[in-house]
């Protein structure tokens, strides 16, 4: 076959990506340039991280056979990372689930039974009985759902409606609680609105990049390629990388900083002090657009109330703050001197000064990037607030090339978990369940009785685990997540509740994950392009894709499962009489009729789909379900700074960044000339706050919940690797990716290994106060911890590192700190 120059370039791009991971070019990638005329191509966002790369999906004879970077996608511009090139293979693992499985003994459900194939009707029969029993005997607080930042937008919206409006339970939370909750609360406290003000276009205009707890080289490799290009093409561009251990992003760093865990709070306050002491405040910006507040301190660690650390806290969980003067703020940060900071963090003084100078230099455009190092932190909200302080002091915000940017880890942690409001405390478009006006807006739009949505915040992720263990949460449905592997403190706080005979656990998943195997009922689930979907990425870009193949066997999408299950409940079975009396016309109706088959949702006919276009859910129901749900959801944000474009526009575009007003997307929010909500002459307006001003918070250093001591003498940090995504439930089923990194290892400093008579390749028992795992010693390679710290990825189901981690959370965001606990090592 003769190759065009473009095809040749594509083939080389595939080969280069594979070589980067030490792999040979797979047949699926070679299909990019082979037999193109026999392959049908369509666009989709990548299934993996929150970058939101665009890919072209090749289908042939009802299967996904190829994938390539979409050259028209503005995020990745035709390039994929190694995971992206192997997307087709995640769908065809040998153990793909194709029918519901229920634990049974002697022909009926039994908690100790074996998984047995059943029909969907049988599965829903059992679920219906369990839900109705729990609702009748103990009320809405006895049921719960754990969802995902991998849900499509309409799946998350449908789930939120079912639980908050249908079952009247706010006990629904996404796995984004474990990764982005601190970012959400940080945004809301400082700006009054969620999500970044900038976009990826900043990369090509920035003079300096500062990574705070973000290994972008492995976790956001496509963005890292753009940063690398910017750095290597411009000699005046600087890269600083801060972490508790050395990783691949350090290879590009001009200033690579290793600091003692938790002491990033000290560094952030030191930089603020440096800016003030060197008269580097942007006085015009600061005086017009900023307020100062002092936050409550000694707020605890989000542990059970009986824990000694919670009992000792003076202000457990307090989000309080009070106004303060500039002089008081200046005095507050003045304590964080260069000498004190160097002593507390272990960072050399010259490196600290170099870092501070980047922010203080008025001629340098600076972008701050962060991910889990900041967010998975018992003071993660504070860390977010403190980095905003630096940009607000200097006015380096909401303009091309400079600003703070919280990166996301999941493809729709922003678009679904945050914007839709699938958290236990949220509603669409930054509204919250505790606000009566917000509840009223939702109830009127959904045409349900006033008072239907509970005012009480539901159980967050870690609280759900505790409630299951305590027998207070009895029916639990998880979708699109593998929390038995990904969540903290498995032995003490998660597994006991899942296996408690009082509780019934449902897991919807394409594969038999650790979570699925611990459940009572497994529902086989369609994935990615086996359904029509939409994701929202880290730069506020909403992207759609069409269903391109059908799911295997009886696997069904999460959306189908939610909508069909809602048919099993009539309003009289879930709502009290006083609610029904307010809307008697809803008596006798099913939740399906009340929530999904409404005049507003069902008004878009199936005929809007192309004749040959797959859409299993809509064709079965007789109306364009996805469009109806999206347009209803989008109504909440339009006119309120969260404007989404009309549904059809997204199928034509490679994503659009909200707010989309008059057909135009927004690259930079809050600044005049860029944001349609900022009027001429206002300059900047942080319109999430009533007075249009952002907040600088005075917040101190406070120690970690657990630190090394004489017995447990090492810090443990957990995270990911390039080749695998999260718990590896998809990537470990790709043979090439599995071979590239087949099992987790314990990265350790050579001197720490030597002191314990350990050598590279030895088996080692890693022990915390909560559990133990056996791993393999690695003293070389990509991750190089300092003495006193070990690092272990969590993708390996055979090495459940979260048996070791502590379920301490940020008390404000309820996000778990997976980066800091104490362990000891024992040679095996």
Swiss-Prot record:
The 4Fe-4S Mo/W bis-MGD-type domain, residue ranges: 39-95
Gene Ontology molecular function: any one: 4 iron, 4 sulfur cluster binding
Matches recorded under SMART domains: Molybdop_Fe4S4
Pfam families per UniProt: Molybdop_Fe4S4, Molybdopterin, Molydop_binding
Keyword Transport: yes
Catalytic activity: 2 Fe(II)-[cytochrome] + nitrate + 2 H(+) = 2 Fe(III)-[cytochrome] + nitrite + H2O
Domain of life the protein comes from: Bacteria
Cofactor(s) the record lists: [4Fe-4S] cluster; Mo-bis(molybdopterin guanine dinucleotide)
Class in the EC hierarchy, top level: oxidoreductase
Binding site for Mo-bis(molybdopterin guanine dinucleotide): 83, 150, 175, 179, 212-219, 243-247, 262-264, 372, 376, 482, 508-509, 531, 558, 718-727, 802, 819
Chain residues that bind [4Fe-4S] cluster: 46, 49, 53, 81
Keywords assigned by UniProt, alphabetized: 4Fe-4S, Electron transport, Iron, Iron-sulfur, Metal-binding, Molybdenum, Nitrate assimilation, Oxidoreductase, Periplasm, Signal, Transport
EC numbers on record: 1.9.6.1
Binding site for substrate: 794
Main subcellular localisation: periplasm
Function, as annotated: Catalytic subunit of the periplasmic nitrate reductase complex NapAB. Receives electrons from NapB and catalyzes the reduction of nitrate to nitrite.
Protein family (similarity comment): Belongs to the prokaryotic molybdopterin-containing oxidoreductase family. NasA/NapA/NarB subfamily.
PANTHER family given in the database record: PERIPLASMIC NITRATE REDUCTASE, RESPIRATORY NITRATE REDUCTASE
Listed name of the protein: Periplasmic nitrate reductase
Species, as recorded: Escherichia coli O7:K1 (strain IAI39 / ExPEC)
């Amino acid at each position: 076959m003769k190759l065009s120059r473009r095809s040749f370039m594509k083939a080389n791009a595939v080969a280069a990506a594979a070589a980067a991971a030490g792999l040979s070019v797979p047949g699926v990638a070679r299909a990019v340039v082979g037999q193109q005329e026999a392959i049908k191509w369509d666009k989709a966002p990548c299934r993996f991280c929150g970058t939101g790369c665009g890919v072209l999906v090749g289908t042939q004879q009802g299967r996904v056979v190829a994938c390539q970077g979409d050259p028209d996608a503005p995020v990745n511009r035709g390039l994929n990372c190694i995971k992206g090139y192997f997307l087709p293979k995640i769908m065809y693992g040998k153990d793909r689930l194709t029918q519901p499985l229920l634990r049974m003994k002697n022909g009926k459900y039994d908690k100790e039974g074996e998984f047995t194939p059943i029909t969907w009707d049988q599965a829903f029969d059992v679920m219906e009985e369990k839900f109705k029993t729990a609702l009748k005997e103990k009320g809405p607080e006895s049921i719960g759902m754990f969802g995902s930042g991998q849900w499509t937008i309409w799946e998350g919206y449908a789930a939120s409606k079912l639980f908050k409006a249908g079952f009247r339970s706010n006990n629904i939370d996404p796995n984004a609680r474990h990764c982005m909750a601190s970012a959400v609360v940080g945004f809301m406290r400082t700006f009054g609105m969620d999500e970044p003000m900038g976009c990826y276009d900043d990369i090509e205009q920035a003079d300096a990049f500062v990574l705070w707890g973000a290994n972008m080289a492995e976790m956001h490799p496509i963005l890292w390629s753009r940063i690398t290009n910017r750095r290597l093409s411009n000699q005046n561009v600087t890269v600083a990388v801060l972490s508790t251990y050395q990783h691949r992003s350090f290879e590009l760093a001009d200033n690579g900083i290793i600091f003692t865990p938790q002491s990033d709070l000290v560094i952030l306050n030191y930089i603020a002090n440096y800016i003030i002491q060197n008269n580097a405040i942007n006085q015009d910006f600061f005086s017009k657009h900023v307020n100062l507040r002092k936050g409550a301190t000694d707020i605890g660690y989000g542990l059970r109330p009986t824990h000694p650390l919670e009992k000792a806290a003076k202000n457990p969980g307090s989000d309080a703050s009070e106004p303060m003067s500039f002089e008081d703020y200046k005095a507050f940060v003045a304590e964080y001197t260069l000498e004190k900071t160097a002593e507390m963090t272990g960072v050399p003084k010259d490196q600290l000064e170099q870092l501070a100078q980047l922010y203080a230099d008025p001629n340098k455009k600076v972008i701050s990037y962060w991910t889990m190092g900041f967010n998975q932190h018992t003071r993660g909200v504070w860390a977010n607030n403190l980095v905003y302080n630096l940009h607000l002091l200097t006015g380096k915000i909401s303009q091309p090339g400079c600003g703070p940017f919280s990166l996301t880890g999941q493809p729709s942690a922003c678009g679904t978990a945050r914007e839709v409001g699938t958290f236990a405390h949220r509603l669409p478009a930054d509204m919250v369940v505790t606000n009566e006006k917000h509840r009223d807006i939702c109830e009127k739009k959904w045409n349900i009785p006033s008072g239907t949505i509970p005012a009480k915040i539901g159980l967050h992720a870690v609280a759900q685990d505790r409630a299951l263990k305590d027998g207070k949460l009895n029916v639990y449905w998880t979708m699109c997540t593998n929390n038995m592997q990904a969540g903290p403190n498995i032995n003490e706080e998660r597994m006991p509740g899942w296996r408690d005979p009082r509780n019934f656990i449902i897991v919807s998943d394409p594969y038999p994950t650790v979570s699925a195997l611990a459940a009572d009922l497994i529902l086989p689930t369609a994935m990615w392009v086996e359904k029509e979907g939409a994701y929202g990425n880290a730069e506020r870009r909403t992207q759609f894709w069409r269903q391109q193949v059908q799911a295997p066997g009886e696997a069904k999408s999460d959306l189908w499962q939610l909508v069909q299950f809602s048919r099993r409940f009539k309003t009289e079975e879930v709502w009290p009489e006083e609610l029904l009396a307010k809307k008697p016309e809803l008596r006798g109706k099913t939740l399906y009729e009340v929530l999904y088959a409404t005049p507003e949702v069902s008004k878009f006919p199936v005929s809007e789909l192309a004749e040959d276009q797959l859409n299993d859910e809509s064709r079965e129901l007789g109306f364009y379900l996805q469009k109806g749900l999206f347009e209803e959801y989008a109504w909440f944000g339009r006119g309120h700074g969260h404007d989404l474009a009309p549904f059809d526009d997204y199928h034509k575009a490679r994503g659009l960044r909200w707010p989309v007003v008059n057909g135009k997307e927004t690259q930079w929010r809050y600044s005049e000339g860029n944001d349609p909500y900022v009027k001429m002459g206002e300059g900047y307006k942080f319109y999430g706050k009533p007075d249009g001003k952002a907040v600088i918070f005075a917040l101190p250093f406070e120690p970690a919940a657990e630190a090394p001591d004489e017995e447990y003498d090492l810090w443990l940090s957990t995270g990911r690797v390039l080749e695998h995504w999260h718990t590896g439930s998809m990537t470990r089923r790709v043979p090439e990716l599995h071979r590239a990194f087949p099992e987790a290892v314990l990265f350790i400093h050579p001197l720490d290994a030597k002191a314990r008579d350990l050598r590279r390749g030895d088996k080692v028992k890693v022990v915390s106060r909560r559990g133990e795992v056996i791993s393999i010693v690695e003293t070389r390679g990509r991750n190089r911890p300092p003495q006193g710290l070990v690092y272990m990825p969590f993708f390996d189901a055979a090495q459940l590192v979260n048996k070791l981690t502590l379920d301490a959370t940020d008390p404000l965001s309820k996000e778990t700190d997976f980066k800091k606990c104490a362990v000891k090592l024992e040679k095996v």
